[in-house]
Design a protein with these regions (language model features):
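Register position in tetratricopeptide repeats
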Residues: 70, 104-107, 141, 175-179
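Terminal, low-structured helical/coil segments at or just beyond the last alpha-helical repeat
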Residues: 1, 6-12, 149-182
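Long, contiguous interaction/recruitment modules in multidomain scaffold/adaptor proteins
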Residues: 1-45, 49, 53
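The canonical alpha-helical register within tetratricopeptide repeats
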Residues: 46-49, 83, 120, 154
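TPR alpha-solenoid repeat register
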Residues: 60, 94, 131, 165-169
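Soluble extracytoplasmic domains of inner/organellar membrane proteins
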Residues: 121-155
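Alpha-helical adaptor scaffolds
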Residues: 30-35, 58, 63-70, 75-125
Length: 182
């Protein structure tokens, strides 16, 4: 027992000394090139300033919309996404983000313009797992559970076994299957 304790302590001390030698040395310096990350509000302000000079920058408009959603300013995000949409109406990611922002303003329901945006995304990329997921949500909101099931089954078919979103879509599929049984 004593020998095992001594070996344990020796290995622990040895490990700490090796790790301390491997750790990067940071010299105390006021200007070491490491900046604090910007807050979401600061990021939004920088993007808005940048867009004054570059109003046609699609990626900046899309990032601004995402940041505005992140701060809960859905109305402003819809405006930013609309500007980005006018520049590039065929960007799948934008279509999904834009539709989601509009749906957030509609109590989470995908109808009207948000539905049209999802349908456009589906026509552009009917093999996209994200698009199929959203198309299933649209169908479920319209109480077309068979169509929702079809979209989600196709999405699961296209996914690898370890895909991070697989569980979410399987749960959605289970929910509508339970609704159809009742």
């Amino acid at each position: 027992l004593i020998w095992s304790m001594m070996i344990f302590l020796f290995v622990g001390v040895l490990s700490l000394s090796i790790y301390s030698q491997l750790a990067p040395k940071i010299m105390p310096n006021a200007d070491n090139g490491i900046n604090e990350p910007l807050s979401m509000t600061e990021s939004i302000n920088k993007l808005e300033s940048y867009l004054i000079e570059n109003p046609e920058d699609f990626q900046a408009l899309k990032m601004l919309g995402l940041a505005q959603v992140g701060t809960g300013n859905v109305e402003k995000s819809i405006e930013s996404f609309e500007k980005a949409f006018l520049i590039n109406p065929n960007d799948i990611d934008l279509l999904l983000q834009y539709a989601s922002a509009i749906a957030a303003n509609q109590d989470g329901k995908f109808y009207g313009k948000s539905k049209i945006l999802i349908e456009k995304a589906l026509s552009l990329d009917p093999q996209s797992i994200q698009v199929l997921y959203f198309a299933g949500i649209v169908a479920a909101h319209q109480t077309d559970l068979d169509q929702a099931r079809g979209y989600w089954q196709k999405a699961i078919y296209l996914m690898t076994e370890g895909h991070p979103d697989r569980n979410i879509i399987e749960q959605a599929l289970d929910t509508i299957l339970n609704l159809q049984v009742k």
